[in-house]
């Protein structure tokens, strides 16, 4: 039996959103690697760079709204401010976590976002996962852990920063989906509303956060044409990365975004080996293979869960609430009464 045309178009759109996210995310990592590494341009101001990203995204959103390419719906300012604060805490905490912890523990903290997102979705939205989904998530976590985790050293400050980063990032990603549903706004509409707030706050606070991280102010950096080109390229890719993130979470869920998002980790490791002569060991290859298998199983498990939900939906439609039964009874009694009255008036 062939799928309806609408389902085919939806599937193509889903694949397109994921492809945009993977390509733009991997591209921005490669651009930032060249921009920020000591062998590149040595631009060590990650938080301020993120401010540039959101400023560029906000500019694109303003142009889109001004030209009528996208509509603007109302979202309360306090919701936008709350979301932006959580998102900015996530960015700053991630940078501090990377500075204070070993690379191995930093990777473990990033992997822990998957179960944390699952738990938060269960607490906030009463979302439950079948055993197949839970098993596939574990396979992905194990696979990515094998290929990325090396030395693991923990300290108190680093642990607190890592916990803050994991919680705030997980909450931010869940909020993207819930805000879109709550106010019936599209992914780009929501992004165009939050980007200006994040841009202003990050451009004001970013240089001070970067000073704490690197001991240098951005004003001391000697700009070159090469660095400016990499910054502009990074900003352009950030627009697509941000849009596709909101698209993917809006279409799927924060959990799916986290699980399938680790395809980016696999791509980054592979491109690092091809373009930057990074070491590729058997451990890396085995871990990537396990992670990919886990992602395939996850996709299958989610599809199985959807089919189960679809089968249970028709039965639910036939069941009526007490209020519906009461209204139906009242309607029948009213009809019977009218028939009796009409019958009495007949000769």
Curated annotation (Swiss-Prot):
Q: Which InterPro entries match?
A: Sugar_P_trans_dom, TPT_transporter
- The portions of this protein that span the membrane are 11-31, 43-63, 80-100, 103-123, 132-152, 159-179, 195-215, 223-243, 256-276, 285-305
The opening ranks of the lineage are: Eukaryota, Viridiplantae, Streptophyta, Embryophyta, Tracheophyta
How is this protein annotated for GO cellular component? Golgi apparatus; Golgi membrane
Subcellular location(s): the record lists: Golgi apparatus membrane
- Give the family, as the similarity comment puts it: Belongs to the TPT transporter family. TPT (TC 2.A.7.9) subfamily.
- What is the consequence of disrupting this locus? No visible phenotype. Slight reduction of galactose content in the cell wall composition.
Task: Sum up the protein's function in the record's words.
Answer: Nucleotide-sugar transporter that transports UDP-rhamnose or UDP-galactose and UMP in a strict counter-exchange mode.
Instruction: State the Gene Ontology terms under molecular function.
Output: antiporter activity; GDP-fucose transmembrane transporter activity; transmembrane transporter activity; UDP-galactose transmembrane transporter activity; UDP-glucose transmembrane transporter activity
**Record keywords:** Antiport, Golgi apparatus, Membrane, Sugar transport, Transmembrane, Transmembrane helix, Transport
Q: Which SUPFAM superfamilies match?
A: Multidrug resistance efflux transporter EmrE
Q: What is the organism field in this record?
A: Arabidopsis thaliana
Name recorded for this polypeptide: UDP-rhamnose/UDP-galactose transporter 1
Q: In which tissues is it expressed?
A: Widely expressed in the whole plant.
